[in-house]
């Protein structure tokens, strides 16, 4: 249900968010 949707959304966002986090570290 909801957790499955959140999981798929997180998988789509992770590739975009990871480089931003990497730049800040």
Curated annotation (Swiss-Prot):
GO terms for cellular component: extracellular region. GO terms for biological process: defense response to bacterium. It holds the Pfam family Caerin_1. Its main location: secreted. Expressed by the skin dorsal glands. Keywords: Amidation, Amphibian defense peptide, Antibiotic, Antimicrobial, Secreted. It comes from the Eukaryota. The modification Leucine amide is found at residue 25. InterPro entries: Caerin_1. It is found in: Secreted. Belongs to the frog skin active peptide (FSAP) family. Caerin subfamily. Caerin-1.19 shows significant activity against Gram-positive organisms, but is less effective against Gram-negative organisms. This is Caerin-1.19.
